[in-house]
């Protein structure tokens, strides 16, 4: 096992890009993706263990809490958490800290990828995608330096009861939205969406993608579709699609990414 481990959930690449930037600064790091159940959960030999994830519906992405409860971290390991968000960081860091106590935590604003809910420009303060990327890169390097010096956050992540309530109803909202997926005639049945889906919720049938109801709204399928053939209501056709420019669709399907 590498000296450093970062567990990462990423739907459209922003969090994986941040995890990779942090890993390059730390060196000798295994990034373990959490889109599905992690390939490795016993990381007691790692000296530093981090977690990078987005805010989904005010909390953790679907399935992440269950995975966190299976992870074994060494008693002397330095632990850190990073949440990326658009408008607000939510209660995800609070939930993570209640499961795996964090020595250090922070939150970073980046592009909103839930375009059926909000436009990308919802970031606070509003910035262009290029500006948001530069800001995230700079912040990732700062985080890595804090981790290398074993910085300690002065207080625990805030509880944010309103966001906890939001997170509790989010699965019902997601279930409703899953019924509104549509695939246009632009689909060329390339299969990229099916390979990306962490729930195996997409299949190629009759020369086009068919999307089922077991969706957690990572939106990898929509944002990485090379033909922009996938939508969730008309509003997603009107809004610009986005995925992180530094992360390929293939990387999101990996289980572990090692960075020297």
Language model: regions and residue ranges:
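FMN-binding flavodoxin-like domain, especially the glycine-rich phosphate-binding loop
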Residues: 2-5, 13-18, 24-35, 43-53, ...
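Local sequence-structure signature of Cys/Sec-based thiol-disulfide redox active-site neighborhoods
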Residues: 4-8, 183
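A generic structural signal for alpha-helix starts
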Residues: 10-13, 87, 188, 216
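Membrane/wall-proximal cationic-aromatic binding patches
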Residues: 38
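A mid-sequence, solvent-exposed acidic-amphipathic segment
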Residues: 160-198
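Iron-sulfur cluster-binding cysteine motifs and their immediate structural context
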Residues: 182-183, 188-216, 220-237
């Amino acid at each position: 096992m590498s000296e450093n481990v970062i567990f990462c959930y990423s739907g459209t690449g922003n969090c994986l890009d941040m995890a990779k930037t942090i890993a390059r600064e730390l060196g000798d790091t295994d990034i373990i993706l959490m889109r599905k159940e992690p390939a490795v959960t016993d990381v007691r030999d790692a000296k530093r263990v981090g977690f990078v994830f987005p805010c989904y519906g005010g909390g953790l992405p679907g399935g992440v809490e269950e995975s966190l409860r299976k992870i074994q971290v060494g008693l002397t390991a330095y632990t850190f958490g990073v949440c990326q968000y658009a408008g607000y960081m939510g209660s995800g860091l609070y939930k993570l800290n209640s499961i795996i106590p964090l020595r250090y935590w922070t939150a970073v604003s980046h592009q909103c990828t839930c375009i059926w809910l909000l436009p990308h420009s919802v970031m606070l303060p509003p910035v262009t995608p290029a500006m948001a990327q530069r800001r995230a890169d700079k912040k990732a390097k700062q985080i890595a330096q804090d981790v290398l010096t074993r910085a300690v956050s002065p207080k625990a992540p805030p509880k944010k009861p309103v966001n906890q309530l939001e997170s509790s109803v989010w699965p019902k909202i997601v279930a409703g939205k899953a019924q509104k997926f549509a695939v246009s005639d632009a689909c060329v049945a390339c299969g990229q969406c099916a390979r990306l889906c962490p729930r195996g919720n997409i299949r190629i049938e009759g020369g086009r993608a068919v999307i089922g109801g077991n969706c957690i709204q990572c939106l990898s399928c929509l944002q990485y579709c090379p033909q922009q053939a996938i939508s969730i209501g008309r509003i997603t056709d009107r809004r610009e699609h986005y995925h992180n420019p530094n992360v390929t669709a293939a990387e999101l399907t990996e289980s572990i990414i090692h960075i020297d």
